[in-house]
């Protein structure tokens, strides 16, 4: 037979457990140790449960006294565990903050910074100059219909001007646009005069890749339609733009031919001792206006187009267009 258990013995055990639990919990250094103590004190096979199991050997009148004392101890232990866990977490966070803190007075190693590609900055500068002249930006699709790329611009199917540019044809009447001029037609279909737009974008031609040609390049188209516009307005606009971009360089206009403008001209600037073609321009052909339902007796306008790569190469002294597409950091870091 097991030895008899007295009320005093169980009460003494609970008092001793209280002291032990208080000491052990206060010395626990992390959450794992506290969890181990919780199981050892409050679990089904824990030390407090062992006292409650022995309580069954007491007379019925004494059992409630032990049960009450055990419940008080459980509450105390739970409170001590919660308080210690909070303190441990706070200490761990403080240690982590101290360990991961940054000394803002230490010399910086520097983080390499990227920057915008010269073609992007050139395009943005060109567009900004025309925005300053009162123009607004218009855009159109790169996969274009034959009608907008050719027919609506006074270039019918049998027109010899179609031989002037090799085109990437797609299925049906779709193609990769060969210039940004289709934006003119699309915009005028939706917006009656007066119109002043600048249209930047990529264009595609079946050119062999060399120092001055690429099958994919960038253009900016300029269009103004209003009452009373003439060639002097075109010339004044082009001169103001070129002066703002290149500075005080000599400029000349040469008679030329474009199917959708009449008269037409090419614009050269004197650069490093030679004349360099930079733009094509002209007065919008009356046939183009009539095709849009506009009266050429009332409205007139001018258009101009330029290659962004050419402007970028002139501005930065680049001798090979392929350098702009190779993603060579040794080259791009210069800008």
From Swiss-Prot:
Q: Which cofactor does it need?
A: Mg(2+)
The cross-references to InterPro entries, in alphabetical order and at most eight, read:
aa-tRNA-synth_II, aa-tRNA-synth_II/BPL/LPL, Phe-tRNA-synth_IIc_asu, Phe-tRNA_ligase_II_N, Phe_tRNA_ligase_alpha1_bac, Phenylalanyl-tRNA_Synthase, tRNA-bd_arm
- UniProt remark on cofactor binding: Binds 2 magnesium ions per tetramer.
Q: Where does Mg(2+) bind?
A: 262
Report one GO cellular component. Answer: cytoplasm
Taxonomy, superkingdom: Bacteria
Disulfide linkages recorded for this protein, renumbered to the chain, are none
Catalytic function, reaction form: tRNA(Phe) + L-phenylalanine + ATP = L-phenylalanyl-tRNA(Phe) + AMP + diphosphate + H(+)
Q: Work out whether the entry's keyword set contains Aminoacyl-tRNA synthetase.
A: yes
For this protein, the record's NCBIfam families field holds:
pheS
Q: Which HAMAP family match?
A: Phe_tRNA_synth_alpha1 (MF_00281)
Q: What family does the Swiss-Prot or TrEMBL record give for this protein? A: Belongs to the class-II aminoacyl-tRNA synthetase family. Phe-tRNA synthetase alpha subunit type 1 subfamily.
Full protein name: Phenylalanine--tRNA ligase alpha subunit
Source organism per entry reads: Parasynechococcus marenigrum (strain WH8102)
């Amino acid at each position: 037979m097991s030895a008899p258990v007295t009320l005093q013995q169980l009460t003494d055990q609970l008092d001793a457990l209280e002291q032990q639990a208080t000491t052990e919990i206060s010395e626990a250094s992390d959450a794992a140790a506290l969890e181990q103590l919780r199981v050892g004190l409050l679990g089904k096979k824990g030390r407090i449960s062992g006292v409650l199991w022995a309580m069954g050997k007491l007379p019925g009148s004494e059992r409630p006294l032990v049960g009450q004392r055990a419940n008080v101890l459980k509450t105390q232990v739970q409170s001590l565990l919660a308080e210690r866990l909070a303190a441990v977490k706070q200490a761990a966070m403080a240690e982590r903050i101290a360990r991961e803190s940054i000394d803002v007075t230490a010399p910086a190693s520097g983080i390499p910074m990227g920057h915008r590609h010269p073609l992007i900055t050139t395009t943005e500068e060109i567009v900004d100059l025309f925005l300053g002249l009162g123009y607004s930006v218009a855009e159109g699709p790169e996969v274009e219909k034959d009608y907008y790329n050719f027919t609506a611009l006074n270039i019918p199917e049998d027109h010899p001007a179609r031989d002037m540019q090799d085109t990437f044809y797609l299925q049906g009447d779709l193609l990769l646009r060969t210039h940004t001029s289709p934006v003119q037609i699309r915009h005028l279909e939706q917006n009656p005069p007066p119109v002043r737009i600048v249209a930047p974008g990529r264009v595609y031609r079946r050119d062999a890749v060399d120092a001055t040609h690429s099958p994919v390049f960038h253009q900016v188209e300029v269009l103004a339609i209003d009452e009373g516009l003439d060639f002097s307005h075109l010339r004044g606009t082009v001169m103001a733009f070129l002066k703002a971009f290149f500075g005080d360089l000599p400029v000349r206009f040469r008679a030329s031919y474009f199917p959708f403008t009449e008269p037409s001209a090419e614009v050269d600037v004197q650069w490093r001792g030679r004349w360099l073609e930079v733009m094509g321009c002209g007065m919008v052909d009356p046939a183009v206006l009539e095709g849009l339902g506009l009266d050429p007796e009332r409205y007139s306008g001018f258009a101009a187009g330029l290659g962004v790569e050419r402007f970028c190469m002139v501005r930065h002294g680049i001798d090979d267009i392929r350098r702009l597409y190779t993603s060579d950091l040794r080259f791009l870091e210069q800008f």
